[in-house]
Structures are given as structure tokens and as C-alpha cells.
Regions:
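PAPS-dependent sulfotransferase catalytic core
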Residues: 1-77, 81, 92-97, 102, ...
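Generic structural signal for small/hydrophobic residues in well-ordered secondary structure
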Residues: 14-15, 60, 74, 90, ...
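Generic recognition of short, well-ordered alpha-helical segments
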Residues: 17, 85-88, 183-184
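Non-transmembrane alpha-helical segments in soluble domains
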Residues: 19-23, 61, 91, 111, ...
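Surface-exposed cleft-lining segments at the edges of enzyme active sites
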Residues: 46, 77-78, 137-150, 255-260
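PAPS-dependent sulfotransferase catalytic domain
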Residues: 52-66, 121-202
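Alpha-helical packing segments of well-folded alpha/beta enzyme cores
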Residues: 60-63, 86, 154-158, 185, ...
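The conserved 3'-phosphoadenosine-5'-phosphosulfate
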Residues: 159-262, 266, 280, 285-291
């Protein structure tokens, strides 16, 4: 079976969580490998390292070989959303696909992305320093797959998918609405995928901030061979459960400074206004509605 739907992002907006719940339904099959990156392979440089990235077409299709007839078949890669190439590449190979997009307050999304970047790259830059660097990349028209700001310019990325897929093939979710009513949102996505049988599922903690439990855990999680082996051998859901039990602990995320918040507000203010016009809705992001 070939994939017929894609959860494309935005990053740090619940895509992994959404794919987890969808995969609970017997009429849905989602690749066990989370974020295969296949359709963003043209975006990456020689210096890009991602253990789960697949560049071979046959290997990519093998991700879906266990799918059954009449199942909705999909995968989730948040890098597709801001990729200059992914939308058109998906359309070329799978033109009848459905696209699922989740949008989060871009200020909170960028801050969450910063912590992921720190963890993955052992980076000690402050949030403000990273904003400086990534703003410079955008100003110089440099596409960098790990840029923490670029995915938050939602309008242009949505338009890229709208240019490649019909309106009824694109489902847009507001992350904050999803968090407030997981059941309703998942049911609406299932309906979008033409699945009308309901399923009961247990709501997990959503996007909790986690850090390594100790120095040993950090060393293992920073080891590329360890991560690569785990990615190849252990399905995503099982890997997350093992990580939560043995390697990670939940803690309170350090607060964003008011200065940093105001800076991001200025970066995204006109973008949010444009997005509300495009979607014809009032977005629930209070940072942008204070008079």
C-alpha cells in the first residue's frame, strides 16, 4: 500500500501526538518510523544528520508494506511544512493525498523548538542568540531545516500546499483547540480521512517538557549510534515509552522572558494578521490580540 495522507507539521505543534492517536484506530496505518523525512531530502545539506532520514524510494515504500487494504495509510514529518520542495514532491508521487496541518501560537512554537534544538545538538546558545542567528539565515534567504523561526511563517507554507492540493484535501488544525478537546479533533481528522467509526482511547500527557534523568542518560541520548540503533530497531511509540520510563523525566520548562516574547511578537505580528485573513478565522493566540 502507498501512503494517502501526510501529517506535515508545523513542528512542535502536536504532530507526533496526533499520529499516535490516529494509529490507535484499526482503519488507520501510520509508519512506525516517525519523521522519515523522505520528501524533504532535497532540502538538506551534507552537514545535516538525522538517523531516521530515508532517501531511497523503495525503502520509503517499505514503511507501509504492513498496511492493509482499505486502511488510511500515512506518515508524519513536520519538516515537510516549511520545506520548499515537499508539497510538490508529494503531489508528484501521490497526487490524491490528503494533508493534515497543525498550527500553534508561533511564539510558543519557536520557544519549544529552541529546546528541542538544544537537546539534539548539545547547543548552549541562549534563546535570544538563536533568534539572532536564525533571523540572519532568513534575511540571507538561507534555508536551514532546523531554523526555529521559519516554520512559524504559516501563511506562505500553507499557500504552498494549497497550490499543490485542492482545498478539500487539506485539513488545518489549531493546536490550542486540539489541546482543549483532543477527542473532538481526532474525530474530525478521522472524518476527513473518510473514517466514520469511533474509537475510545486514553489521552496521554501532551508535549510535556522532558530532560535526561541523569548524566548517563544524557550521554546515551546524545550518542548518534545509540539513537540510530534505537530508531531502526524499536517502533516510535515503544521508543517513547522506554524513553519516558528509563531515560527522561518531566520537569517545568524555563519561562520565556517578556523581552523575548515581545521580540517574537514583533516578528510574527503581521504574519498572524495575514493568516487570519487566509483562514477567515480569529486565532486564539492572545499575544496578538492585546489592545
Amino acid at each position: 500500500m502507498n501512503p494517502n495522507f501526510f501529517i506535515v507539521g508545523a513542528s512542535k505543534s502536536g504532530t507526533t501526538n496526533i499520529s499516535y492517536y490516529l494509529n490507535e484506530h484499526p482503519d488507520v496505518f501510520i509508519s512506525e518510523l516517525n519523521e522519515p523525512y523522505y520528501f524533504s531530502r532535497l532540502d538538506v545539506s551534507k552537514n545535516f544528520k538525522r538517523e531516521s532520514m530515508i532517501t531511497d524510494y523503495e525503502k520509503y515504500l517499505s514503511l507501509f508494506k504492513k498496511a492493509k487494504k482499505n486502511q488510511a495509510v500515512g506518515e508524519a514529518t513536520s519538516a515537510y511544512f516549511s520545506s520548499p520542495h515537499a508539497a510538490s514532491e508529494i503531489r508528484k508521487m501521490f497526487p490524491d493525498s490528503k494533508i493534515i496541518i497543525s498550527l500553534r501560537n508561533p511564539i510558543e512554537r519557536a520557544y519549544s523548538s529552541y529546546f528541542s534544538y538544544q537537546f539534539m545538538h548539545k547547543n548552549d546558545q541562549s534563546f535570544s542568540e538563536m533568534i539572532d542567528l536564525h533571523q540572519k539565515q532568513i534575511s540571507n534567504d538561507e534555508f536551514y531545516i532546523y531554523n526555529i523561526l521559519e516554520p512559524g511563517f504559516y501563511t506562505k507554507h500553507i499557500k504552498r500546499f494549497q497550490e499543490n492540493f485542492a482545498k478539500d484535501k487539506i485539513k488545518i488544525i489549531i493546536f490550542e483547540d486540539y489541546i482543549n478537546n483532543v477527542f473532538f479533533t481526532i474525530e474530525s481528522i478521522l472524518s476527513f480521512l473518510d473514517i466514520h467509526t469511533k474509537i475510545n482511547f486514553h489521552v496521554q500527557s501532551k508535549g510535556a517538557y522532558r530532560v535526561p534523568k541523569n548524566k548517563v542518560s544524557r550521554k546515551l541520548l546524545e550518542n548518534s549510534f545509540f539513537r540510530q540503533t534505537a530508531t531502526k530497531l524499536i517502533p516510535t511509540v515503544s521508543r517513547q515509552k522506554i524513553g519516558d520510563k528509563f531515560f527522561l523525566k518531566q520537569t517545568k520548562k524555563p519561562p520565556m522572558s517578556q523581552q523575548e516574547r515581545e521580540r517574537l511578537k514583533k516578528i510574527y505580528e503581521s504574519e498572524v494578521s495575514e493568516l487570519e485573513v487566509l483562514l477567515d478565522i480569529k486565532l486564539p493566540w492572545s499575544d496578538f490580540h492585546v489592545k
